[in-house]
Protein backbone atom coordinates (compact mmCIF):
# COMPACT_ATOMS: atom_id res chain seq x y z
CA UNK A 1 0.00 0.00 0.00
CA UNK A 2 1.19 3.52 -0.80
CA UNK A 3 2.07 5.94 1.96
CA UNK A 4 -0.82 8.10 3.14
CA UNK A 5 -1.20 11.43 4.91
CA UNK A 6 -4.31 11.81 7.05
CA UNK A 7 -6.13 15.16 6.98
CA UNK A 8 -9.20 15.72 9.12
CA UNK A 9 -11.74 18.53 9.38
CA UNK A 10 -12.03 17.74 13.12
CA UNK A 11 -8.60 18.54 14.57
CA UNK A 12 -9.39 16.66 17.81
CA UNK A 13 -9.93 13.48 15.80
CA UNK A 14 -6.62 13.55 13.92
CA UNK A 15 -4.35 12.25 16.71
CA UNK A 16 -6.58 9.26 17.62
CA UNK A 17 -6.95 8.49 13.90
CA UNK A 18 -3.16 8.43 13.54
CA UNK A 19 -2.86 6.15 16.60
CA UNK A 20 -5.39 3.74 15.12
CA UNK A 21 -3.65 3.89 11.72
CA UNK A 22 -0.33 2.94 13.32
CA UNK A 23 -2.10 0.10 15.16
CA UNK A 24 -3.26 -1.17 11.76
CA UNK A 25 0.20 -0.83 10.25
CA UNK A 26 -0.85 1.82 7.73
CA UNK A 27 2.18 3.65 6.27
CA UNK A 28 1.76 7.26 7.44
CA UNK A 29 3.93 9.93 5.86
CA UNK A 30 3.50 13.71 5.59
CA UNK A 31 4.41 13.42 1.89
CA UNK A 32 2.03 10.52 1.27
CA UNK A 33 -1.23 10.51 -0.65
CA UNK A 34 -3.72 12.79 1.14
CA UNK A 35 -6.71 11.13 2.79
CA UNK A 36 -9.31 13.80 3.62
CA UNK A 37 -11.78 12.86 6.36
CA UNK A 38 -14.86 15.07 6.65
CA UNK A 39 -18.07 14.64 8.63
CA UNK A 40 -21.32 14.35 6.73
CA UNK A 41 -24.11 11.96 5.88
CA UNK A 42 -25.26 9.02 7.96
CA UNK A 43 -22.85 6.28 6.97
CA UNK A 44 -19.43 5.99 5.42
CA UNK A 45 -18.25 6.87 1.93
CA UNK A 46 -14.68 6.35 0.71
CA UNK A 47 -13.79 7.64 -2.74
CA UNK A 48 -10.22 6.70 -3.72
CA UNK A 49 -10.46 8.14 -7.23
CA UNK A 50 -8.36 11.20 -7.93
CA UNK A 51 -5.20 12.53 -6.33
CA UNK A 52 -6.65 12.53 -2.81
CA UNK A 53 -8.86 9.98 -1.08
CA UNK A 54 -12.14 11.52 0.10
CA UNK A 55 -13.73 10.01 3.22
CA UNK A 56 -17.14 11.22 4.36
CA UNK A 57 -18.27 9.82 7.72
CA UNK A 58 -21.48 10.10 9.69
CA UNK A 59 -20.07 9.04 13.07
CA UNK A 60 -16.67 8.91 14.73
CA UNK A 61 -16.89 5.12 14.57
CA UNK A 62 -17.26 5.33 10.79
CA UNK A 63 -14.18 7.56 10.53
CA UNK A 64 -12.10 4.90 12.30
CA UNK A 65 -13.70 2.12 10.27
CA UNK A 66 -12.53 3.90 7.14
CA UNK A 67 -8.93 3.29 8.19
CA UNK A 68 -9.33 -0.48 8.18
CA UNK A 69 -11.02 -0.33 4.78
CA UNK A 70 -8.41 1.90 3.12
CA UNK A 71 -5.99 -0.78 1.84
CA UNK A 72 -8.68 -2.75 0.00
CA UNK A 73 -10.50 0.35 -1.23
CA UNK A 74 -7.27 1.85 -2.58
CA UNK A 75 -6.39 -1.41 -4.30
CA UNK A 76 -9.80 -1.72 -5.97
CA UNK A 77 -10.02 2.01 -6.83
CA UNK A 78 -13.76 1.81 -6.32
CA UNK A 79 -16.09 3.92 -4.18
CA UNK A 80 -17.05 2.21 -0.91
CA UNK A 81 -20.42 2.92 0.74
CA UNK A 82 -21.70 1.60 4.07
CA UNK A 83 -24.63 2.47 6.33
CA UNK A 84 -24.68 1.63 10.04
CA UNK A 85 -27.26 -0.88 11.21
CA UNK A 86 -26.91 -0.13 14.92
CA UNK A 87 -26.34 3.07 16.88
CA UNK A 88 -24.41 1.20 19.58
CA UNK A 89 -22.07 -1.63 18.65
CA UNK A 90 -19.27 -2.97 20.81
CA UNK A 91 -17.77 -5.69 22.96
CA UNK A 92 -18.01 -6.79 26.58
CA UNK A 93 -14.70 -7.64 28.24
CA UNK A 94 -14.83 -10.02 31.19
CA UNK A 95 -12.53 -8.29 33.67
CA UNK A 96 -13.69 -10.25 36.68
CA UNK A 97 -11.96 -12.58 39.08
CA UNK A 98 -8.52 -13.59 37.83
CA UNK A 99 -9.02 -12.39 34.26
CA UNK A 100 -8.23 -8.71 34.67
CA UNK A 101 -6.53 -7.32 31.53
CA UNK A 102 -3.86 -4.70 32.11
CA UNK A 103 -4.85 -1.14 31.15
CA UNK A 104 -2.29 -1.18 28.30
CA UNK A 105 -4.09 -4.20 26.83
CA UNK A 106 -7.39 -2.33 27.01
CA UNK A 107 -5.88 0.74 25.30
CA UNK A 108 -4.82 -1.51 22.43
CA UNK A 109 -8.26 -3.14 22.35
CA UNK A 110 -9.91 0.30 22.21
CA UNK A 111 -7.83 1.22 19.15
CA UNK A 112 -8.60 -2.08 17.44
CA UNK A 113 -12.32 -1.86 18.20
CA UNK A 114 -12.35 1.68 16.79
CA UNK A 115 -10.70 0.43 13.59
CA UNK A 116 -13.52 -2.11 13.24
CA UNK A 117 -16.12 0.64 13.55
CA UNK A 118 -17.20 -0.33 17.06
CA UNK A 119 -18.24 2.50 19.35
CA UNK A 120 -18.58 0.81 22.75
CA UNK A 121 -16.46 -1.25 25.11
CA UNK A 122 -17.94 -2.52 28.35
CA UNK A 123 -15.99 -3.93 31.30
CA UNK A 124 -17.68 -6.66 33.32
CA UNK A 125 -16.23 -6.41 36.80
CA UNK A 126 -17.18 -8.12 40.01
CA UNK A 127 -14.70 -7.29 42.71
CA UNK A 128 -11.95 -5.98 40.46
CA UNK A 129 -12.41 -2.28 41.16
CA UNK A 130 -10.53 -0.76 44.05
CA UNK A 131 -12.81 0.69 46.75
CA UNK A 132 -10.78 2.78 49.23
CA UNK A 133 -13.33 2.32 52.04
CA UNK A 134 -13.22 -1.47 51.64
CA UNK A 135 -9.56 -2.55 51.48
CA UNK A 136 -10.40 -6.27 51.43
CA UNK A 137 -12.86 -5.98 48.54
CA UNK A 138 -11.16 -8.00 45.81
CA UNK A 139 -8.25 -8.76 48.12
CA UNK A 140 -5.41 -10.68 46.41
CA UNK A 141 -6.89 -10.15 42.94
CA UNK A 142 -6.02 -7.74 40.18
CA UNK A 143 -8.09 -4.59 40.48
CA UNK A 144 -8.46 -1.31 38.64
CA UNK A 145 -8.02 1.89 40.59
CA UNK A 146 -10.50 4.73 40.14
CA UNK A 147 -7.75 6.66 38.33
CA UNK A 148 -7.15 3.77 35.88
CA UNK A 149 -10.88 3.54 35.11
CA UNK A 150 -11.03 7.31 34.56
CA UNK A 151 -7.99 7.20 32.24
CA UNK A 152 -9.51 4.31 30.26
CA UNK A 153 -12.79 6.18 29.93
CA UNK A 154 -11.04 9.39 28.82
CA UNK A 155 -8.92 7.46 26.32
CA UNK A 156 -11.93 5.63 24.89
CA UNK A 157 -13.84 8.92 24.50
CA UNK A 158 -11.18 10.06 22.00
CA UNK A 159 -12.13 7.16 19.72
Sequence positions of predicted segments:
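Contiguous, structured surface segment used for ligand recognition
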Residues: 1-86
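Feature activates predominantly on carbohydrate-active enzymes
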Residues: 49-159
Amino acid sequence: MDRICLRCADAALLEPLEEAARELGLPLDMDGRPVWLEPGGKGLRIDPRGDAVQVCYGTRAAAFRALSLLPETLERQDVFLQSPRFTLNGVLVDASRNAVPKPETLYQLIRRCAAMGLNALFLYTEDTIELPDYPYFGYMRGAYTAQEIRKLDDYAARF
